[in-house]
Amino acid sequence: MYFNNELSNLKDHLLVTLQNNSDVERDRINFILWDLKFLDCFLHLKRLPFASECGMLEFSQKMIEIWKIQSHREPYDCPYWKEVIWKTKQEFRAEYSFPNTSLAANKVDDVSPKFVMEVIDVFVENLNVVVKINDPYSWLFVPEHKEQIEQVLKELKLLRFFVCFVSNKCIEPQYRHTTFYIHALIEASHIAMVVWLHLPVLNGIVNQYLAPSEVSRLRSDFMEMKIKSIQPDISRNNIYIDVLQALKSTIPQAQNKHAVESGIVETPTQNLTVGLSDQMVNLQEMLCFLRDNLIHLPILDLEFHLQDMDSVIVDAGLLIYSLYDIKGEKEDTVLDNMNRALGFDLPRNIEPIKAMVYLVMQKAFQSNLPRVHGLGYVDFLLKNLKDFQGRYSDSLAFLKNQLQVIQTKFESMQPFLKVVVEEPHNKLKTLNEDYATQIIRKAYEVEYVVDACINKEVPQWCIERWLLDIIEEITCIKAKIQEKNTVEDTMKSVIASSQLARTPRMNEEIVGFEDVIETLRKKLLNGTKGQDVISMHGMPGLGKTTLANRLYSDRSVVSQFDICAQCCVSQVYSYKDLLLALLRDAIGEGSVRTELHANELADMLRKTLLPRRYLILVDDVWENSVWDDLSGCFPDVNNRSRIILTTRHHEVAKYASVHSDPLHLRMFDEVESWKLLEKKVFGEESCSPLLRDIGQRIAKMCGQLPLSIVLVAGILSEMEKEVEYWEQVANNLGTHIHNDSRAVVDQSYHVLPCHLKSCFLYFGAFLEDRVIDISRLIRLWISESFVKSCEGRSLEDIAEGYLENLIGRNLVMVTQRDDSDGKVKACRLHDVLLDFCKERAAEENFLLWINRDQITKPSSCVYSHNQHAHLAFTDMKNLVEWSASCSRVGSVLFKNYDPYFAGRPLSSHAFSISRILLNFKFLKVLDLEHQVVIDSIPTELFYLRYISAHIEQNSIPSSISNLWNLETLILNRTSAATGKTLLLPSTVWDMVKLRHLHIPKFSPENKKALLKKSARLDDLETLFNPYFTRVEDAELMLRKTPNLRKLICEVQCLEYPHQYHVLNFPIRLEMLKLHQSNIFNPISFCISAPNLKYLELSGFYLDSQYLSETADHLKHLEVLKLYYVEFGDHREWKVSNGMFPQLKILKLKCVSLLKWIVADDAFPNLEQLVLRGCRHLMEIPSCFMDILSLQYIEVENCNESVVKSAMNIQETQVEDNQNTNFKLILIEIHLFYLFDMKGIESISTDMKEKKLTVTRDVDADEVQLVVEKLRNVAYADEVQLVVEKLRKRGML
């Protein structure tokens, strides 16, 4: 908007003229708009005498006449008009001078602060345009003076802040400060006039029109643009002092103008150019801290302290501006004179400023902390405080006493925090959790203050004061706890820590919908001969996925189909990932070629399904386009193939339907609702009659929605079975949950113990519909300090208890359990729960997702995001943009990848990810998924506790030991580095906090240096994929890791002078996987691991003597897997009585075993026997008939005699032993078809039934797929024979 109507009309006419001329570039138009905007402002000042006296109005009118001529002249000649404008402004420059009129002569009663700010805003806007121009051909390009103009722009903004501050704080009539406002107008106008007069710059002809002296004066104009004095006879500082003293006399009431305060603080600090004492230097430092932190203070805190801040700002301004007019005296004299003249005592007046600076810094930090915490954070802090004081003793010397007191205080609170974790649900629990939260927040503050001290980011006086306050606050918290005797009262009711997971495991058996299940089952098994889509739709939480999975796993259904495959789509999906998921189910994991393009995978899926009857489950479809993508892969050959599809949307269900109408899944009826609630709360038991009425009322309140019912059941199952408590739940639920499933989730979250809230919200960091690996989840929980230590139990065991508790509350769904011990291996969250976790985590400053299409920019909300505990990114560009704004973030979780970066080293790009990560100075967890390759490990981030990433290098820098907090190091290798041995520096053994080290095929870099080192990794629990070529190397590494629980390693012909040297593994070792790279070489050591439960040997040459001697050292072994093993002693294995007393699972795959002799009591506790590819084995020993614990035998690709013996065992187990739970699975892959054929026509597979059928004449690509499949599921010798026959036929 223009102030002057004539100029506005001229602007419109010029634009029309120029836009009709195709030769006029946009840059020229921008310059015209820029120039006219300045002229408009200059004319707006015509009522002020100074505008006429300095020539501003006259110059403006002449320039307008030139533009009028331009607007009527054709054709438009850019170079000519640029020269005309330049010459005209050159003439103006010769006549223009700084306004020297008196301020009194310029007083105009209606000059308001609003008017002043409007003018300054226009000038700022126009100068912003100039500093952003980098094109040397632009008319607005400033080649040599951009830095000076940026300083000018800063001064203008500060002046505007000052005007705004005075205007907002002044309760007197504004005319009292007219002198100040006129002064601001004159200075701003002069700045704008100087810049306007020097643009545009003529490229290459500057010197033609400017003499060297003029160029020098031009530069001088810019260099002197910092505001010095308004005129020779009047001091600008006197004007400022007068207005500040007027403000000081009466401070106005608080207003929501915190941005003004943060801006005005910068004004005095910019002008401290005179010599100052040390105290004044401190004042400048304090005002800088006040400026930097003030804008981050929440409005409520700001309003509460606004009057004090106003007073501090005014006093600081008075102190500084009073010094400007005093020159030529010594500093001490200056200060004395100033104190006497103005009644100031500088040291005494600095104290309130210091107090306000500290208060603002403290409040700004505290108010933006995450509101959900892990109780293990105090454990982490206590360890770090000791390390900090050792590593940074010089920096922290003056804090030694305070830190020791704080350490003692936190240690004294550890028993209380343990009580909070272990106590049951009772009336004191909420109060205790509040105290625990206060303690954790103090721990966050200590960490920040100590780091700020080390890095000299906060002044020493502030740090000392902050720590003293922390000590006082912790003392106060402890006193409150002791006063209420909460520890003693609660300890009486503390249950054993083993009862953390006391809630019965979630019963995954479906309840209700019996009529719906029967209807759908009939549609799947009967109906049309053609392909049919059975689609279900309905609102979230109805149980669509649960019902679909029930049908998909129903034996009476599955047995009628050759192939079964499923995929979960979700709102954001990858077409290729869906195809891969379906192919893995259809043909097996080992046969899927992930490197193929999506179109090739789609064609492979179609050919796989073409001749077979298939059952496909496509879950959670959001759009019709998903069905368009997938439907072409599902051929219809009139063999009653079926597809189950679930969606929230009726339109999608209808779009995908073929013959059957879409099924709208109904709500539960009242009977089903109560039946489900009762089942989830009481398991196989019945509800007490006293609770039945209130229980049925609660079930009815859940709105007949299954998800709501199971969530409420999770709440009830954790409470005392008393009517009083159930009434409380009913009252809290209210009536609104009928239409709001989030209300039920919110209630479930509300009653969670504080140590589980952070664990639950952390699920929000995972992508929708993703299966979550439990080992990885637990490692992350521990690294995030969610898990509170407990003497006598490992953190992993405690975390498993947390998980089982969440499962028992029906907040987490189990997707896979371990066959041997029943522990959860994988889980997922319902979409409704996942959405809740993401939303609530953002509200609590706990977790923030930065998505590819993120609207909010980092600059708009820096501090709130800076304080989030965790950030999840889905795009590398987001990571770059946000890194500078998130220095205090504790975790960076990268959940997707830009294809440009996937699988490639970032060092070759314009920026490196390691350099970007250095901005996250408090980073504790770095979890990079999907093959994001880091160019180097960020060894400067010493807070890091968890790293998971991909690397391409074949070595790790020795500086890795700088990460002295690191507990988990997971480095995957890119395809380019696969197979190469990675060299691990000896400094890794100095990283004594390491708990998990996972690196494919690594070896110590300097074994001699490692041998000399006395350091050990006593905390290391899992070690994956070291590579050994000598027994001595293995022994050395095992000595360095005495507390290992899991070990996976690769060996190559370990040489040792004695054939059966005993290799002593750590006493706590529970899982061992040994793989030999050179297949069928003898194993040169005997395994001794007294507590080993899981042993897997692959690629070795073994005999009965070796296995017998090894078994003597493995009396607690529960799982034994022998893969690709060559048996000596004429391919015979003798198992004597008592060799494997605790063995539960025995798997033999592709072993050259011919004769198997087993004593009657060799496997007294065996539950599962799996034989795959044992084509030389004659039979399964008959003693397996009498093993009463046996539940399962699987035979795949073995001789008929083995199959027959398995069937005999089944008959005896079921009929004679009455073992009704016994199962026999026979899997057959017909390799012999390939040996007798002269050609091949077609290939089909059924991995569900484990059948392979091959006929004649197909192309070589399909044959190659079959061969790859055989290599994964069949015996190696026969596959090689098949390959040779195919080569001879010219097919490979």
UniProtKB/Swiss-Prot annotation:
Domain named HMA: which ranges? 1211-1278
Q: Which Pfam families would you find in this protein's record?
A: NB-ARC, NB-LRR, WH_DRP
Q: How does it sit in the membrane?
A: Peripheral membrane protein
| Chain positions of LRR repeats | 842-865, 920-944, 963-991, 1066-1089, 1094-1113, 1114-1142, 1163-1187
GO cellular component terms, A-Z: cytoplasm; membrane
Instruction: Tell me the first and last residues of the signal peptide.
Output: none
What protein name is recorded for this chain? Putative late blight resistance protein homolog R1C-3
Annotated organism of origin: Solanum demissum
What would be the name of the gene that encodes this protein?
R1C-3
